[in-house]
């Protein structure tokens, strides 16, 4: 009698059918799905598509994106609108699932609740937890050679990096910490001493000194004021009246022969 292992006609058992295979949606579930379709379009797809389309248009207009030779920014805008439509539909799936799970006597809502409670991939592992698990794996975990430790640099242990700097002689001339430089304030204070403050002078002292300087200025022969020359009055020239030579008549008239 042949064993079933040696029988070549043995076939693996068929897979279990999907729970939603040949599922008949109820009227309430169909109504909820239609509401989800409408709400996802107006609340998610339309804003996302409009935003991505405007970004594509202004990107081509400002030169950030390369437009089509014939159609310009139209292809980029259409692609942005289509991408925003699908992103909006995908982002509304969780809210639509919550609406279906709130329906009473819904087999689809019961399946969604069991999947959430039973540990689906999306519901059981959050992004933060998944990221933490990824960094704890072997390729990301630090090895002993990568971990920094200052034990090798401690003075108690003799290693090749322990440099005996304290026993070496130091030359004070080579130490430029206290060497004066152009930026040093001590050099400026040593070479440029401040002038002593002059005693204050009163108004009487200034007045007396001004008088002395004025008197010295007046006594100097080169500083005498300019004196205009005295105008000489000229006497009027008297015309000498020459008496005509000759005899006079009885009336005083003179004549010559």
Swiss-Prot record:
It comes from the Eukaryota. Residues 156-170 have a biased composition (Polar residues). Pfam families: OCIA. Expressed in all cells of the primary lymph gland lobe. InterPro entries: OCAD1/2, OCIA_dom. Residues 1-20, 148-257 are annotated as: Disordered. The keyword DNA repair does not apply. Residues 204-216 have a biased composition (Basic and acidic residues). It is found in: Endosome. Its main location: other. GO terms for cellular component: early endosome; endosome; Golgi apparatus; lysosome; membrane; mitochondrion; recycling endosome. Residues 1-110 form the OCIA domain. GO terms for biological process: embryonic hemopoiesis; endocytosis; hematopoietic stem cell homeostasis; lymph gland crystal cell differentiation; positive regulation of receptor signaling pathway via JAK-STAT; regulation of antibacterial peptide production; regulation of mitochondrion organization; regulation of stem cell differentiation. Maintains stem cell potency. Involved in endocytic pathways that mediate signaling during hematopoiesis. Belongs to the OCIAD1 family. Interacts with STAT3 and ARF1. Marker for all hemocyte lineages during development. 'Asrij' stands for 'blood' in Sanskrit as this protein is strongly expressed in blood vessels. This is OCIA domain-containing protein 1. It comes from Drosophila melanogaster. The gene is asrij.
């Amino acid at each position: 009698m042949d064993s079933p292992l040696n029988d070549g006609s043995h076939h693996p058992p068929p897979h279990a059918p999907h729970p939603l295979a040949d599922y008949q949606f109820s009227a309430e579930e169909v109504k909820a799905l239609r509401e989800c379709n409408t709400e996802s379009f107006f609340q998610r797809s339309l804003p996302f598509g409009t935003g991505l389309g405007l970004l594509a248009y202004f990107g081509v207009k400002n030169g950030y994106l390369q437009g089509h030779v014939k159609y310009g920014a139209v292809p980029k805008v259409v692609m942005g609108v289509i991408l925003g439509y699908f992103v909006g539909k995908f982002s509304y799936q969780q809210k639509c699932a919550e609406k279906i799970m709130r329906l009473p006597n819904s087999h689809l809502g019961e399946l969604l609740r069991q999947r959430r409670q039973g540990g689906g991939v999306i519901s059981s592992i959050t992004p933060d937890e998944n990221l933490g698990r990824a960094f704890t794996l072997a390729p990301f975990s630090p090895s002993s050679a990568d971990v920094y430790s200052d034990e090798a640099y401690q003075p108690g242990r003799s290693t090749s990096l322990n440099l005996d700097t304290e026993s070496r002689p130091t030359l004070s001339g080579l130490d430029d910490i206290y060497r004066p430089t152009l930026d040093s304030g001590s050099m400026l204070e040593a070479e440029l001493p401040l002038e002593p403050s002059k005693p204050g002078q009163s108004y009487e002292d200034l007045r007396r000194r001004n008088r002395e300087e004025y008197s010295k200025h007046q006594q100097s022969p080169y500083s005498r004021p300019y004196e205009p020359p005295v105008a000489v009055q000229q006497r009027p020239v008297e015309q000498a009246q020459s008496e005509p030579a000759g005899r006079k008549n009885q009336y005083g008239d003179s004549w010559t022969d």
